[in-house]
């Protein structure tokens, strides 16, 4: 006789991964509950990560755009906004996103339970509710989508009012004149752009030898130059020895012997999975040193009835990929296999000012692979649309095979890069002979548009062939 469970599946976490899994499961007729530890759904992406930081960035970039526009640059009407004002804008966006996502669950009759989940045995969860009570829930299968949080080294005092991580920075109540950012990954670079755009002095401490080393080197160099040109001080190959919080700021002692002082510190060097409270040892699961779980191609953990998606499994740690991982896991959970798979070339969007976005292979990788490729470039400053709106900083680069004309990689630096990249991605994903750079020469683009950069870059690249 089959065992009777409260639910077919329980999803732990309501971020993009949890939402993708829950929606995928209910659409297939499964009885699903979603456990969320906070009062509102959306996870870290909505409340502390993607949404608020991008809302901040947008507000700051619009202020920069206004102040740099020659129509308004008589210095009598320069825009100024406090960090608190800009955070209010982010809060409005968060509230809209929360209401929308709450509606998804309600319309699909997906039960949401608030509390902290922990495993009791292979099919049982204990739910510690906000009122102090404990509920017991059973399910045949589980999806762990509990996300991640900023990594906190034990020798840094995050209780100090001037030491922030990428979550607590959203609660900053003072106006810093000088910010230290430790960690020059995606989060560190994005906040360096935001603070510098608000005319705050920024010291960016990079533990590596160049910014965002996973990017095509030309894009990384473009960002480095843009930071240098805007006044961001970048210190490469540095690690902290000691961090001291004091009444008027923070002092950082570097292993190289340097000392830096600023009004506050943003520590943005890595993230860790939110798995420590799940009591995974009770079901025989182990995490790595950063609290992340290993999964197979169908997002199953070492326990076949337990799946994991999103930040808790590490790379690529993107909201967009997490949602797709959730949908794929839901299909595998119900049917035993998934026909859908995560695409091979996942686009990356980095919301610095200006943006960086890429899809496919870099020049460095193609050179190492000994692939005969060619490069086509378009500078934004040569596009009519960019000249009209004053977006002269930026470039689009297309890498393609010299013989087959197949597009191998696309890299973009400039405003709207994360939108522009998808035009090229759509052609790259075409099967058969559909993936060819000649498409951009043979199609007609609206004029004037930023999309026209593809035609300019394609012609530039094809003209290099002989």
UniProtKB/Swiss-Prot annotation:
E.C. designation(s): 1.6.1.1
A matching Pfam family: Pyr_redox_2
Keywords: Cytoplasm, FAD, Flavoprotein, NAD, NADP, Oxidoreductase
Cofactor(s) the protein needs: FAD
PANTHER family registered for this protein in UniProt: DISULFIDE OXIDOREDUCTASE, SOLUBLE PYRIDINE NUCLEOTIDE TRANSHYDROGENASE
Function: Conversion of NADPH, generated by peripheral catabolic pathways, to NADH, which can enter the respiratory chain for energy generation.
Quaternary assembly: Homooligomer; probable homooctamer.
Name recorded for this polypeptide: Soluble pyridine nucleotide transhydrogenase
Organism: Escherichia coli O157:H7
């Amino acid at each position: 006789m089959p065992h009777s469970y409260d639910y077919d599946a329980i999803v732990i976490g309501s971020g993009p991964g949890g939402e993708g899994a829950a929606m995928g499961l209910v659409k297939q007729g499964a009885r699903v509950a979603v456990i969320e530890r906070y009062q509102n759904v959306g996870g870290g992406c909505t409340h502390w990560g993607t949404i608020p930081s991008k809302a901040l960035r947008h507000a700051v970039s619009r202020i920069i755009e206004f102040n740099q526009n020659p129509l308004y640059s008589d210095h009598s009407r320069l825009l100024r906004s406090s960090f608190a004002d800009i955070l209010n804008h982010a809060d409005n966006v968060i509230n809209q996103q929360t209401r929308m996502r709450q509606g998804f669950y309600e319309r699909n009759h997906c039960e949401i339970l608030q509390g902290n989940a922990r495993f009791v045995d292979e099919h049982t969860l204990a739910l510690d509710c906000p009122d102090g009570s404990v509920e017991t829930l059973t399910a045949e299968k589980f999806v762990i989508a509990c996300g991640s949080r900023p990594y906190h080294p034990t020798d840094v005092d995050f209780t100090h009012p001037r030491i922030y991580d990428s979550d607590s920075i959203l609660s900053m109540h003072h106006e810093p004149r000088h910010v230290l950012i430790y960690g020059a990954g995606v989060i560190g670079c994005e906040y360096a752009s935001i603070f510098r755009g608000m005319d705050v002095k920024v010291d960016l401490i990079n533990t590596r030898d160049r910014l965002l080393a996973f990017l095509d080197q030309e894009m990384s160099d473009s960002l480095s130059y843009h930071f240098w040109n805007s006044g961001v001080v970048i210190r490469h190959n540095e690690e902290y020895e000691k961090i001291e919080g004091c009444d008027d700021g923070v002092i950082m002692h570097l292993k190289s012997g340097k000392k830096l002082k600023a009004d506050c510190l943003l520590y943005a060097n890595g993230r860790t999975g939110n798995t420590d409270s799940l009591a995974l040892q009770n079901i025989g699961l182990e995490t790595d040193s950063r609290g992340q779980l290993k999964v197979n191609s169908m997002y199953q953990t070492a326990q076949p009835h337990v799946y994991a998606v999103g930040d808790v499994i590490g790379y690529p740690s993107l909201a967009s990929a997490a949602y797709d991982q959730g949908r794929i896991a839901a299909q595998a959970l119900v049917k035993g296999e998934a026909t859908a798979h995560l695409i091979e070339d996942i686009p990356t969007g980095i919301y610095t000012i200006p943006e960086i976005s890429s899809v496919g292979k870099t020049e460095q990788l193609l050179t190492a692979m000994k692939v005969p490729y060619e490069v086509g470039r378009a500078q934004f400053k040569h596009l009519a649309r960019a000249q009209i709106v004053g977006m002269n900083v930026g470039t689009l680069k297309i890498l393609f095979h010299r013989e087959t004309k197949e597009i191998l990689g696309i890299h973009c630096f400039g405003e709207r890069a994360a939108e522009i990249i998808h035009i090229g991605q759509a052609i790259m994903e075409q099967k058969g002979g559909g993936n060819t750079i000649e498409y951009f020469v043979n199609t007609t683009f609206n004029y004037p548009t930023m999309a026209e950069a593809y035609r300019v870059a394609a012609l530039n690249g094809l003209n290099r062939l002989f």
